Structure formats: structure tokens, C-alpha cells
Amino acid sequence: ENIDYDFYGFQNKEPIWGNDFYQALNNSKMGLNLSRGLPTKYYTSNRIASLMGNGLLTFVDKKTQLDDMFNSHEVIMYNNVNDLTDKINFYKKNDNLRKRIASAGRKKYFKLFNELNIAKYILDKSLGKKATLY
């Protein structure tokens, strides 16, 4: 099945910034959180904040182990390109489920990474205290 997608800043498609970026998010239902290089435990580009914060169903490579923070009712983990394709096609056909998971993911993201939690984490790290986010 065909998947409509845009990859900005890739293969001669200019990157988009500012309002154009947020307009593209607003016109999207799902987002792929790709990071440069090989997947690394808990590493993600800041793109995840834009995707999840704007309520998009977000797909993340399982090798990042972000499923330690988010469950399958909040983010969609994929194992490889074929798995990703199957999952995108599934959620394309299951809009209510897509919306529920995206909404739960947005809520969880804001719970984990709000300004108070981040400030406390930075202060605890700076003062040599045990620091955790989740």
C-alpha cells in the first residue's frame, strides 16, 4: 500500500524551518523520529519533542530502548523498515487507535519532560545527587 510522506532536508528536498515546519506537523498524522548515526540507548534528536508535543503518532527505532520510558500505548516502536511499513499501514487504517496512542504519548511526554522535571534533573546532576527522569 502507498504511504504518503515527506522527508525534508533529504534527497534534494529543502529543509523547512519555523512556521513552515509547524504547519507541516499540523498537516501530519504520524511522524518518524529518526536520529543521525546508529541507534543509541535513549538517544533521540529533539525532533521527538516536536512530534510528540504536537500530538503525532510517533514511530521510534526499538534499538533506542525508549520503550523503557514509553509503552506501546504511547509510542510505536519498530524493528526494521518492513516492520515500520506494516505499522504505518496499520495505523493508517485505524485512525481512532492512532489518535488515542498519539494523545497518550503527548501526555506522557509532557509528564516526563516538563520544565520542573528537567530543572530538577539538571540541578541534581550539578550537585552530584542521584538524578532520574522516569
Task: For each feature predicted by the language model, list its residue ranges.
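Short acidic active-site motifs
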Residues: 20, 83-86
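Nucleotide-sugar donor-binding catalytic core of glycosyltransferases
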Residues: 1-73, 77, 129
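Short, flexible helix/strand-to-coil boundary loops that buttress conserved ligand/catalytic motifs
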Residues: 70, 88, 102
